[in-house]
Amino acid sequence: METMGFVPDYVPKQPYQSWGTEFVVLVEDSKDFISLQHIMVMYFEQDDGSVSKPIVVKHWRQDWKYQDSEINAYVGNNTWKKKRPLWAEKKGAWSQAVYQVDDSPRYQGYGRWEHADSFSSWTSSETWRPLPRREASIRDDYDVMIGTNIQTITPCLL
């Protein structure tokens, strides 16, 4: 959520909310490559207060590759450029490529897993990425987000 601007007289945009349940489906799991498809299941409240039937929507996908030799780096203005990392950058690292709903690239970065007794965690390099569709459709004052992804896996406690 925006709390301030960096130009005079800037007024933060009104926050919005969205709801849904997200499921992740394993598409492929081979030695050095994993592909995960995210699926959204949404319900909407109707004008009469009733709840709609579920709507299932293909959401984003993430592909993981071990010691990836090339990644797509977002450079702004809906443009990506191929980047070939140095061996030291990719050695022992997994890349995470995130794709939008239409399977076009969104962002990609390298990271390494840290394993502890109670969790495993992967932290990406800092990456540029385009605005999410939900923001790009209502915002025109910027077109790049800079982010770091952290994926943490913990034991399932039933």
Language model regions located:
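Short N-terminal edge-element motif at the start of the domain
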Residues: M1-I34
